[in-house]
Amino acid sequence: MKPLTNGDLFKSPTLIKISALVFVTVAFFYLGKHWSDDGYQQLVFFSSSTSGSSIPEVSVSPNSNRVFNLSAIIPTNHTQIEIPATIRQQPPSVVADTEKVKVEANPPPPPPPSPSPPPPPGPVKSFGIVDANGVMSDDFEVGEVESDTVEDWGNQTEIVEAKSDGDSKARVRIKKFGMCPESMREYIPCLDNTDVIKKLKSTERGERFERHCPEKGKGLNCLVPPPKGYRQPIPWPKSRDEVWFSNVPHTRLVEDKGGQNWISRDKNKFKFPGGGTQFIHGADQYLDQMSKMVSDITFGKHIRVAMDVGCGVASFGAYLLSRDVMTMSVAPKDVHENQIQFALERGVPAMAAAFATRRLLYPSQAFDLIHCSRCRINWTRDDGILLLEINRMLRAGGYFAWAAQPVYKHEPALEEQWTEMLNLTISLCWKLVKKEGYVAIWQKPFNNDCYLSREAGTKPPLCDESDDPDNVWYTNLKPCISRIPEKGYGGNVPLWPARLHTPPDRLQTIKFDSYIARKELFKAESKYWNEIIGGYVRALKWKKMKLRNVLDMRAGFGGFAAALNDHKLDCWVLSVVPVSGPNTLPVIYDRGLLGVMHDWCEPFDTYPRTYDFLHASGLFSIERKRCEMSTILLEMDRILRPGGRAYIRDSIDVMDEIQEITKAMGWHTSLRDTSEGPHASYRILTCEKRLLRA
């Protein structure tokens, strides 16, 4: 073999390959070093593995302590994602070091690693304020509204221009809505219309407590202000027992009912001991008594949806929540000053409603239990027409509990009232199941057999078969007994929680065009919202949001509320069924959820600052044909708490105008893509209401 010479060595292919590999390695090492020092701020990773149900998620490089210049890599039209505060903040020292690196073209070799920092201090085991004696005290209050959520707004409405689009009517563009007068801070438009109330021909049947909405063009056109000193509400479950005085600054209820263990004032808070007029020793003891009286009253199983009439501060409903029962607490506005407002501030479901001359806005066979404790209603007046309304809303086989003086006192006048009540319930075919102490409990029949077997001419009569017991919008009370469906629909719902996802029988009675099987449509809606809420929980950290009072403004079958329940979010949802669509309220109640009928072209029957979260899916693209979108949005602003959020999921066609109006209301908004991507016809507008001050 011929030995290699020096020239042959340099011509060897092996050496050429080794040299090339070394050169490439050095080059990549230099480029990697240059990229690491000069462009590190550009590193951010967006998850591309989004499922069909989730919205875009943000994941951050493990080296998240470095500073990112997000605006340099995200296009202006990209879906905006909330970035954690730890990433948004840029300490001055870090910024200065970064700029220094950019200026130096040839940085010196890195210094040797510094010694590791000392370990972080242990977790804080106590937190408080040191008093004058040097002793730490935890007796201090936290709850002021954060400064970055407060804005000086003024009280003048700013109009920019008036324009007309062809043949359409002229539209006034509002740059900024002004603040309403302080006197309107608890304004409920349809219940505070004094001009109309003064003109009523009669008020003896409670007509003044019913809806009397402002005429078209005279509705709300300003932002309802909060009371002075308004604070972020105390979160649930602590709010069940105490709320800020400054949020509901009224003491009349304390003066009237303080001795009955309803409510008391302690410095800057109202406290709720849990008592009531007929259960001074507490609601829990009272509920235990009811369960012992009737074995079938199993809260959280047979009894899932209840109504408390003349609810006071809603302690009955508040304590039923811990037993997995949703209670709609109702009372007229201002019978005892602001009792419904107290209930809502506590985080308990409630609405202003009155038994007067019209049907309440709930469907037939809605409630498993209806409760009245000293509710100041004469059930036997006008041949029992008010108890007939209770009968309409009470589920077949459901219970009516009456705690009142005629049940247990033996004065002649009270005994006469008891006899009248007993005779009326017999004519309704109700069965007196138990009378014990000051409580009497009746049960409604499961079918019409008893009604049909009564003697001819017995009053009250059965309603005509043409009567729709679910027609409730501005419908007068009827002096007749609502029929129970012949097939038992509404009376044979499963136990909770199975009823939440079981397609109810009354699904077949809903009047709407269905191109697929209704049960499949029901299940598809539940799956749709379950996946979307799952995406919100993962990407937008919904479990960290302070959600308690939630309003779904276009509820369908109640899939949104069911999904919140499935994902264990500690909130309650009122599902609204608009009058402009099919009446799905019976289905919502058969599932064990709360709902109400409403027309969003009119104001809602609740106090200002009621809800933490408003959800509107497909609402504006439908209702804009009937009324101005600003009408709906101003009402949303009235009932949303400062710091509360609204998610508007709707067509691209309406988003520009919605954004314009929300900006004029002082809301902070962000437009996002849906899970279908940037080319879908729908968008999600996430909104946050700020605390505005004049």
UniProtKB/Swiss-Prot annotation:
Region (Disordered): 83-128
Enzyme class: transferase
Keyword tags: Glycoprotein, Golgi apparatus, Membrane, Methyltransferase, Signal-anchor, Transferase, Transmembrane, Transmembrane helix
One protein family per Pfam: Methyltransf_29
Residues carrying sugar: 69, 77, 155, 378, 423
Annotated membrane topology: Single-pass type II membrane protein
GO molecular function list: methyltransferase activity
One of the GO BP terms on file: methylation
Bilayer-spanning residue ranges: 15-32
Signal peptide coordinates: none
EC number: 2.1.1.-
Localization per Swiss-Prot or TrEMBL: Golgi apparatus membrane
Any coiled-coil regions, as ranges: none
Pro residues composition bias: residue spans: 106-123
GO CC aspect terms: endosome; Golgi apparatus; Golgi membrane; trans-Golgi network
Family (UniProt): Belongs to the methyltransferase superfamily.
Name of this protein: Probable methyltransferase PMT11
Species this protein is from: Arabidopsis thaliana
